[in-house]
């Protein structure tokens, strides 16, 4: 459920913000337009947000700036510490992950996440969306930004291109984690009662907006 990558998150806590700012050449294309992508997710979110994979709190900060109530979930203690420092106690950040998390104390209208849903296998994504469908009322939404691929061929080409450019850390990451394709995501959203749309943000990342339909 993504916790197999916890050691990596904890090692990345100190340098994550530098990576998203483009200092890591291998991940520069992944984080291209990072601030704009986070702003897009924050703008699409409703007023009461359950955020998964808070990390160092970059999306959380944008949500708070827009007057949202945020309940954050983050499995890494060092990341939670970084987020708490950045947010100065303005949001509740709790231990948990996409599948095991404390239930918010009030109804939520949005579930948000950036650069994190790929930590779940497709089967775990299915399980997670089943849970979220129960949490959200009709009209509620899921707004995720994450690396995904148009199809399997595009995924294969991305790995080959990373290798050709000498970006072996990026290629290893693409092969190690559970990146998926748009057709798989669309099918999973539909299965659990969501109408989903996808908007490409850079060579890797798509914003996914999935609205819960009337049951």
Curated annotation (Swiss-Prot):
Molecular function GO terms recorded: S-adenosylmethionine-dependent methyltransferase activity
Enzyme class: transferase
Keyword presence, S-adenosyl-L-methionine: yes
Binding-site list for S-adenosyl-L-methionine: 53, 74, 97
CDD domains in UniProt: AdoMet_MTases
Keywords, comma-separated and alphabetical: Methyltransferase, S-adenosyl-L-methionine, Transferase
Record-linked InterPro entries: Methyltransf_25, SAM-dependent_MTases_sf, Uncharacterised_MeTfrase_YrrT
A GO biological process held by the record: methylation
Assigned EC number: 2.1.1.-
Purpose of the protein: Could be a S-adenosyl-L-methionine-dependent methyltransferase.
Family under the similarity heading: Belongs to the methyltransferase superfamily. YrrT family.
Protein name: Uncharacterized methyltransferase GK2543
Native source species: Geobacillus kaustophilus (strain HTA426)
